[in-house]
Amino acid sequence: MLGALLLGGCDRQSAEPAQPAEAPQAAAPAATGTIDRSFAGRIMPAADLTAPGGATLSLAATRGKPVLLNLWATWCVPCVTEMPLLNQLAADYDGRLAVLTVSEDLQGEEKVVPFFEQRDLANLPRWMDEKNDLAVAFGGGAALPLTVLYDAQGREVWRVIGGYDWAGATARQAIDSAL
């Protein structure tokens, strides 16, 4: 059931099937996400992430530094479109903001490893939410991409549902004002 909710939730803006063999290389869809502060103050969900090869990260261990948490999937067109923008954002804010990209792909490592191998995303981590704990924590049917900014104490500042221009001045101003 949860998988069906996730598959249906992606703000794909495309007539493509929800889970094609690989993300299409067509023109990028327009960014539709907007900053939503209505969840401000909520505590970061408790979840353990896994990296290819088996390393783990407890989200609780990220406290002490602001975190931009991005839930994405290889089959989600806006997710794939914003990955290079998030990669540059991670480089630009290195040391001041942790950018955590977390795959919600049901096939986990099987999809995530080739995705990263085919792209130059050296500044982004390859975390996976294998049990979909984060998807459940954000309501079970959360649309992808979902990006949430947390302050150093692990409290939500704002979130964006849908594709977003992470290279734009609005994004940078919203991040800078929260750091």
Annotate each predicted stretch with a short phrase.
Residues 81-120, 130-137:
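Structural microenvironment flanking redox-active thiols in thiol-disulfide oxidoreductases
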Residues 66-67, 97, 145, 155:
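Alpha/beta-hydrolase fold active-site loops
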Residues 48-49, 149:
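Hydrophobic beta-strand positions
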Residues 116-123, 128-178:
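Thiol/disulfide oxidoreductase modules built on the thioredoxin-like
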Residues 58-80:
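Short active-site neighborhood of thiol/selenol oxidoreductases, capturing the structured segment around
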Residues 63-65, 95, 121-123:
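Active-site acidic short loop of glycosyltransferases
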Residues 1-46, 179:
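N-terminal targeting signals for export/organelle localization
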